[in-house]
């Protein structure tokens, strides 16, 4: 029998004397010992091997006095886990840029295989209309992947790819990366799995940008993070030339307020709503080839699930972890591919 698994599910087996008394044996997920998030809430992760999860085949048997009972054993299967839209990075499309050097110029994103409005895209990339190297497709093995590489057009822009959309504001020469997509979770994942290949370098004197405390000798790390959210709207992060002017006129604090950065590992929930779970992975050294990566999800709430129609999934990849601060090395490269949930 195929069973539906809505979360890290709890099941129970009931038995009783006919007409009298009830006994219940439970099969439930178990959680790692909790730790405290910097915002003050406890966070925890799912233990592998406990509970009932999506995409699994389970064996069961009844045991009495430490001995199996003949004829009371079998298997059951739960429904397959969900796919992440276009997570295999094999299908790419183009949509018109907000600022295009040539009439009709377009830039790429992973998605449907025909031109469409950005509003219909699941993945987006910031500032790609200025320089198309920030996110392009690359041929790797039997399919395609996303290739992220930073560039400077007056200020530094990191190679990036995220679930959401990007809006360009011409009057400010700035843009807003708006993070989050509506995604109907049917099962609670334990982790996000993907593959990556990376080149990382020291930040360098020219790449310091506006990051407080950054040093030229610091490694310009790549970063991938994921969030399960329950947001009323997307969270918007500003980047672009206006920030340089704000810093000169009002100081770094004003720049950061305008930028509105968000880091799920260190920050409290933003104004848009709750972060139910998050996971983060920093790429601190270059790789010699493809690396398999599993990013464990830390749950701030073990019972909640996103409400229908809310912005519920954030995945963000950047060739420079502090690209929001216009900080990074243009030599950094990041290839990403095969995004999928682990249950």
Give each language-model segment a name:
Residues 1-8, 13:
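Single conserved hydrophobic/aromatic residue that forms the stacking wall/gate
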Residues 16-53:
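Recognizes extended acidic, P/S/T-rich segments that occur
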Residues 21, 93-149:
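Extracellular glycan-recognition surfaces and repeat-rich motifs
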Residues 63-67, 316-320:
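Beta-strand-rich extracellular modules
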Residues 65-82:
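Extracellular fibronectin type III
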Residues 233-307:
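Extracellular carbohydrate recognition and processing domains
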Residues 287-289, 305-308, 320-343:
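Extracellular carbohydrate recognition
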């Amino acid at each position: 029998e195929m069973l539906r698994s809505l979360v890290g599910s709890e099941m129970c087996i009931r038995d009783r004397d006919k007409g009298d008394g009830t006994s219940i044996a439970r099969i439930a997920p178990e959680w790692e010992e909790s730790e405290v998030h910097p915002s003050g809430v406890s966070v925890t992760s799912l233990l592998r091997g406990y509970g009932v999860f999506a995409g699994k085949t389970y064996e069961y048997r009844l045991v009495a006095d430490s001995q199996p009972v003949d004829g009371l054993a079998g298997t059951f299967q739960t429904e397959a886990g969900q796919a992440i839209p276009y997570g295999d990075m094999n299908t790419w499309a183009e949509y018109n840029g907000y600022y295009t050097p040539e009439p009709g110029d377009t830039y790429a994103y992973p998605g449907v295989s025909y031109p469409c409005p950005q509003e219909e895209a699941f993945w987006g990339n910031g500032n790609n209309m200025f320089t198309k190297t920030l996110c392009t497709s690359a041929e790797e093995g039997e399919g395609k992947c996303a290739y992220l590489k930073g560039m400077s057009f007056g200020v530094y822009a990191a190679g990036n790819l995220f679930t959401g959309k990007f809006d360009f504001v011409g009057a400010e020469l700035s843009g807003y990366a708006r993070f989050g997509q509506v995604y109907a979770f049917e099962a609670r994942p334990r982790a996000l799995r993907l593959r990556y290949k990376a080149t990382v370098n020291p930040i360098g004197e020219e790449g310091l940008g506006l990051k407080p405390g950054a040093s030229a000798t610091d490694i310009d790390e790549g970063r991938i993070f994921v969030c399960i959210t329950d947001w009323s709207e997307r969270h918007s992060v500003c980047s672009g030339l206006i920030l340089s002017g704000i810093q000169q006129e009002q100081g770094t604090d004003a720049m950061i307020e305008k930028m509105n950065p968000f880091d799920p590992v260190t920050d409290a929930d933003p104004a848009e709503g709750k972060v139910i779970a998050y996971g983060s992975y920093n790429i601190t050294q270059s790789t010699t080839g493809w690396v398999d990566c599993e990013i464990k999800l830390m749950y701030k709430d073990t019972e909640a699930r996103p409400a229908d129609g809310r912005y519920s999934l954030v995945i963000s990849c950047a060739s420079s972890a502090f690209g929001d601060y216009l900080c990074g090395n243009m030599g950094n490269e990041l290839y990403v591919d095969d995004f999928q949930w682990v249950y």
